[in-house]
Curated annotation (Swiss-Prot):
Single GO molecular function: IAA-Ala conjugate hydrolase activity
Family: Belongs to the peptidase M20 family.
Organism whose genome encodes this protein: Oryza sativa subsp. japonica (Rice)
Record-linked Gene3D superfamilies: 3.30.70.360, Zn peptidases
Gene: ILL8
Keyword Hydrolase among record annotations: yes
Protein name: IAA-amino acid hydrolase ILR1-like 8
Length: 444
């Protein structure tokens, strides 16, 4: 390339200077935490990490872990929550959405906004395969998604917040929610009306592939909208040796399975995430009999509510069309009453920025990371639709569970474990997010 002449060099200098002026007003990606915020985070983390406090947290988590309860069956867990709130001196409403508890801490320093902090309480229908002293004592039930830790962290936050009650300007609501696992407990909590006055809401979820002391999230769309479906194809049963005298629903189901895969590969923008997974197939139970009916079921997900609605429409159309082509009838059920579809979890930019700043002040900027979008569904989305919300992952891994020789056991695994040193971190972060929000939005 030939060297530029003098005129060209002058133009380059002018352009560079203009760029400096143009972008000088833009904020940098990180800002130093105020001394007051940093001190708040340090104080709360030190209090939660003190031997007596941390031991109390571990004891709570182990008691909950040993007695897991499924969706809307969290009777014993709810009793434990209420007993601890009574001991701390925090009033509450119960029952909420059957087994839930909503506690309220009214600040003694004046009026202000209402901040909600949320933890889910239910376990999963899994047999725990981790051999340890505090293993689940309930056959076929396990806290394999860390909800025992979530409840513990929020109880820890309750204790921290109650100790500072007289300094708070505003109200903090602590939501101990039932039935996150597929049953949309958040929706039912909102139906109670107890959160109608909430200004903002914050939630945490454990994640085993991040170490203790690290949190992660992202602004905007974070977790997918998710729904389930089931379909039954009805034909005409008969002898497998004379299929022409029957109407085979197994062929119709098979055709539908293949056609449904094209929803992602041929109808979805490759730059937009979507999933259609068939996870259940049922037909006959004899080798020489064409069954009268066959069925399929599965899940579908999208990073947008609009995308989920499109998938729902097309799933019905494809199933009914494939049934018709194969001379069968089809009934499609999206299980909207039993397993209500979850909206996409979308973090409010302002609330995400607030929680991120608090976490950076407490844990250090290097320990607050940008998370990848997740195709997991989360009913925190219902809250975030109603009030500006922020949902963060909190690390529960360590050198043993994340080391080179270790296979990270994901949530929903019967081998899932967590490092209890994360419990004080979660308790302190919950409390700090709420306190700092009230401090920044003082109504006086």
């Amino acid at each position: 390339m030939a060297p530029p002449n003098a005129s060209a060099r002058l133009l380059l200098l002018v352009a560079a200077a203009a760029a400096v002026v143009l972008f000088a007003h833009l904020p940098t990606t990180t800002t130093a935490a105020s001394p007051a915020l940093k001190a708040l985070g340090e104080d709360l983390l030190a209090a939660a990490g003190a031997a007596g406090f941390a031991g109390w947290l571990s004891g709570l988590r182990r008691r909950i872990h040993q007695r897991p309860e499924l969706a809307f069956q969290e009777v014993r867990t709810s009793e434990l929550v209420r007993a601890e709130l009574d001991a701390i001196g925090v009033p509450y409403a119960w029952p909420v959405a059957r087994t839930g508890v909503v506690a309220t801490i009214d600040g003694g320093a004046g009026a202000g906004p209402v901040v909600a902090l949320r933890a889910d309480m239910d376990a999963l229908p899994l047999q725990e395969l981790v051999d340890w002293e505090f293993k689940s004592q309930e056959k076929g039930k396990m806290h394999a998604c860390g909800h025992d830790a979530h409840v513990t962290m929020l109880l820890g936050a309750a204790k921290l917040l109650q100790s500072r009650k007289d300094e708070l300007k505003g109200t903090i609501k602590l939501v101990f929610q039932p039935a996150e696992e597929g049953h949309a407990g958040a929706y039912h909590v909102l139906e109670s009306g107890l959160l109608d006055d909430v200004s903002v809401i914050f939630g945490l979820h454990v994640i085993p592939n991040l170490p203790v002391g690290v949190v992660a999230s992202r602004p905007g769309p974070f977790m997918s909208a998710a729904a389930r479906f089931a379909a039954t194809f009805t034909g005409k049963g008969g002898h497998a040796g004379v299929p022409h005298d029957a109407v085979d629903p197994v062929v119709a189901v098979s055709s539908a399975v293949l056609s449904l895969q094209q929803l992602v590969s041929r109808e979805t923008d490759p730059l937009e995430a979507a999933v259609v997974s068939i996870t259940i197939l049922k037909g006959g139970d004899a080798y020489n009999v064409i069954p009268e009916s066959a069925s399929l079921g599965g899940t579908f997900r999208s990073m947008t509510d609009e995308g989920l609605a499109y998938l729902m429409k097309r799933i019905r159309e494809i199933i009914e069309a494939q049934a018709g082509v194969n001379r069968c009838a089809a009934a499609v059920d999206f299980l909207e009453e039993e397993l209500r579809p979850y909206p996409a979890t979308v973090n409010d930019d302002g609330m995400y920025g607030h929680a991120k700043a608090v976490a950076e002040a407490m844990l250090g900027e290097a320990n607050v990371r940008v998370a990848a979008r997740s195709m997991g569904g989360e009913d925190f989305a219902f809250y975030a639709r109603r009030s500006p919300g922020a949902f963060f992952f909190i690390g529960v891994g360590n050198e043993t569970t994340m080391g080179p020789a270790a296979a990270v056991r994901p949530v929903h695994s019967p081998h899932f474990v967590l490092d209890e040193r994360a419990l004080p971190v979660g308790a302190a972060l919950h409390a700090a997010v709420a306190i700092e929000y009230l401090n920044k939005h003082d109504c006086s």
